[in-house]
Amino acid sequence: MNEEDWNWCNDINYNSIINFSRSFLPHLMKEEETALINTSSIFGIITTPNNTVYHASKFAVRGFTESLAKEMEGSNTQIHCVYPGHIGTNIAVNAKFGDQVVKGESKEGILGLNGEPVKDIKGNQVSEKEAGIRFRDAGMDPDKAAKIILKGIKKNKKRIFVGIDAKLMEISQRIFPDSYWRMTVSYTHLRAHETGYN
C-alpha cells in the first residue's frame, strides 16, 4: 500500500475520531448527562491478512476510546466503543480499494488478490459495484444495528458488539487467541457462499 492510501485510511478511521472527540468532549462535559460513542470494528478485535492498515486504525480507535472511558469514569459523560460486524451499509459499494485489497479491475470485473477474476457461484465474473451491493444486502439492517447500539448505551456498556458475527468473533478471539483465525476463515467462507461467491 502506498503512503497516500495509508494516510487516507488512518485519517478517515482514526484521526477523525480523535479530532471529533477532542472537539466535542468539552461541550459534552458541560451538560448534565451525555455520552460519546466512537465506532471501531470487529476488526479492532480480530485480525485478517491483507488488511494491515485497516486493522491498525481500528485497533487505535479501540485503544483511544477504552483509555478515554477509564479517564472519564465518575464524570457525567459515558464513553462507549462500538464494534460492528457485518452491517448492511454502502461501505463496500463506496470503498476505496487499494492494491492491498484487489489487484485491479478488468473490463469484466474485479480481480482478486491472486490476480484471478472474482466470480459468483454460477461462474459469472463480478464487478466491484456488484460485489459491494451483494455485501451490503447480506448484512444486518442498519436500523436494527442502531437499536442495538442505543440499548448498549442505556445499559452503559463500554464495549458494544453489533451482530452475532461480531460477538462470536470476539468470544473466539478471547478463548482461542492463537487459533481463532481458522474459525474466522470458516465463517467468512460461509458468508461468501450466502452472498453468492465461491
Identify the meaning behind each predicted range.
Residues 74-160, 164:
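SDR active-site lid
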Residues 21, 57:
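Active-site helix of classical SDR
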Residues 2-7:
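Substrate-binding pocket helix/loop in short-chain dehydrogenase/reductase
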Residues 41:
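Residue(s) in the substrate-gating loop at a strand-loop-helix junction
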Residues 46, 67-77:
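Active-site-adjacent segment of SDR/Rossmann-fold oxidoreductases
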Residues 46-53:
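Active-site loop immediately N-terminal to the catalytic Tyr-X3-Lys motif
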Residues 188-195:
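Conserved small/polar residues in nucleotide/adenosyl-binding loops
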